[in-house]
Amino acid sequence: MFAKRFKTSLLPLFAGFLLLFHLVLAGPAAASAETANKSNELTAPSIKSGTILHAWNWSFNTLKHNMKDIHDAGYTAIQTSPINQVKEGNQGDKSMSNWYWLYQPTSYQIGNRYLGTEQEFKEMCAAAEEYGIKVIVDAVINHTTSDYAAISNEVKSIPNWTHGNTQIKNWSDRWDVTQNSLLGLYDWNTQNTQVQSYLKRFLDRALNDGADGFRFDAAKHIELPDDGSYGSQFWPNITNTSAEFQYGEILQDSASRDAAYANYMDVTASNYGHSIRSALKNRNLGVSNISHYASDVSADKLVTWVESHDTYANDDEESTWMSDDDIRLGWAVIASRSGSTPLFFSRPEGGGNGVRFPGKSQIGDRGSALFEDQAITAVNRFHNVMAGQPEELSNPNGNNQIFMNQRGSHGVVLANAGSSSVSINTATKLPDGRYDNKAGAGSFQVNDGKLTGTINARSVAVLYPDDIAKAPHVFLENYKTGVTHSFNDQLTITLRADANTTKAVYQINNGPETAFKDGDQFTIGKGDPFGKTYTIMLKGTNSDGVTRTEKYSFVKRDPASAKTIGYQNPNHWSQVNAYIYKHDGSRVIELTGSWPGKPMTKNADGIYTLTLPADTDTTNAKVIFNNGSAQVPGQNQPGFDYVLNGLYNDSGLSGSLPH
């Protein structure tokens, strides 16, 4: 949402709210291993597993003419600004400072003065499809414009269409937040089924025109089905479309109910963005502060960013201070990681370093060239080719200005937040050899498990063998290798194969090979006894005959069996406790008693373990490891997701406990 120009008594509260510290994924991707278009290893198999370019204020024609550059920069999807009819404020002036009018709908016909016509939208979507790029539309369906006279008759003809424009007063009150008006904008009566049908027709039309998904603006201001007497079926209805990817803008606070919204869509990790910006400002990339996503929602349902259009363009200018170097470093952190879907915000030409709107461009123009910068592009490509690989975050030699993310044995990203170059000499799983930095100048060497080289000041290094980018890539969606995943009844798994893969097969427990295409699914566990294990092997082959294999492990566990987790204690604490808890609405249930939880037991292999009673309900539980004072994750951050039989280090889940 936005705060620009609304000089009301509520604005300071709303601006402060934006600064608080505190999916429906409908079907698999359409592309298969046999798909023939201009997509290649630069584009991930699905929106969820790729990166998104937020083409803020770019017109449809601008997007169409830059689609090849977007593709070559490694993005899997673009996110548009709102595409429907909006109020043309300030005589329709297209100066960047007038961006907020795009968030004041007057009707839900597609096309507006700022971005272009519906036909131009269709042509842009067709160009995106040619390059294997997916299109996400920013859908403003919580409210209309604040100018009642400007609202179209087709909206006003819907009986009882609005809650009115009485402004929100208590931002901790769910009823107030969802049933009253954001900044005086007329609030849709989202309980009204005629309103739901009207808005859904707009979404369906956008999909028919070529869109692939949606960002739902101000999503937390629309009630959920279980929001008491004012709850509605709005979200179950609205998200029941053919969209591949849908996520909601859920700016986190005490009333945001992030995890509940995640039952219907992916959600934004706004607190994590604040953690990243704080780390950049302090030039401290300590993994204890930036490893956790600061959300009770699992990483695979999060959209992450270094900054958003709100943090950049609102009057409080929360992130406008950042330089291009800051954004490169932040992007190296969030987009090198597994799990979440990173969103890159395209600033206006010349923006940043404290200047929001330098006047070098207007609404409709392309943003700054940073979106296709060498380092940004290298990290995007790294993100794509590392899909399915585990992550290991660290600060080499204890230097908190150096961030390192090692993705299995396939690749490494380094970021140096400091003002001086730093010599790297650290353990790695990369194969021996020389690695040229794909993000900039310099090269690194690996010998006998040691990575050595120099990373320049305020820079990024992206390292992986050249053949990985062209290699076939097959993986199981949302599951890691090197970890034994548990389930209780039966489990349906989605298979993925990238555009390099011309042939893909899987095996279960050394059984017959079964061919698959990207997005195919299979089920394990039905009717099988508890304790049965499953080894799933994937093999992909490219057009040159190069093959790659991946191995995954699963076990069907009795939900009544003992629940054990382990911690590797990399900090060598003399006392290790596990504090395990979960949320029931606003109530915290402490599964290991009050802080600091229960002591863990050191085993002969040096791993600390804790076993909970078999009847403990650990659904959606979190765990924090601590020694009574220091803790992992860091203070004021939610715990790691509790995974039965999981083995943890300071970056989170690292594997499974030995049998």
Curated annotation (Swiss-Prot):
GO terms for molecular function: alpha-amylase activity; metal ion binding. The active site is at residues 217, 249. It catalyses: Endohydrolysis of (1->4)-alpha-D-glucosidic linkages in polysaccharides containing three or more (1->4)-alpha-linked D-glucose units. Its cofactor is Ca(2+). Residues 28-41 form a propeptide. This is Alpha-amylase. Its main location: secreted. Monomer. InterPro entries: A-amylase/branching_C, A-amylase_C, Alpha_amylase, CBM26, Glyco_hydro_13_cat_dom, Glyco_hydro_b, Glycoside_hydrolase_SF, Ig-like_fold. It comes from Bacillus subtilis (strain 168). Keywords: Calcium, Carbohydrate metabolism, Glycosidase, Hydrolase, Metal-binding, Secreted, Signal. GO terms for biological process: carbohydrate metabolic process. Binds 2 calcium ions per subunit. The gene is amyE. It is an enzyme of class 3 (hydrolase). It is found in: Secreted.
